[in-house]
């Protein structure tokens, strides 16, 4: 779902769900939160780069299971995405999103 590469002070986070347009499912969001937290805590990292594997950067929130989610589960999913977005907005290092193709909804918010 997510690959993490470190090189010369740059942490690259690559969304790995090309078959779903790199839509933000719960596991991917949690992986991004964890990886970003680690990058921000590492004093040798000066830049965080986000990329999407395949044709699209990120098509937003994964709604494929929306019909099966309770209101509480949907709210939690939205809160976690907002947590990720707030982390990136207030990042102590440079953040770069290399967007291509479709970049919708919460995917556009990553920019």
Task: Provide a role label for each language-model segment.
Residues 1-53, 86:
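Conserved CoA-thioester-binding segment of acyl-CoA-metabolizing enzymes
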Residues 13, 50, 62, 110-111:
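Hydrophobic/aromatic residues within transmembrane alpha-helices
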Residues 16, 61, 100:
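Histidine-centered beta-alpha loop that forms part of the nucleotide-sugar donor binding/catalytic region
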Residues 42, 53, 69, 91-94:
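Structured helix-beta-strand junction loops
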Residues 85-111:
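Glycine-rich beta-to-alpha active-site loop
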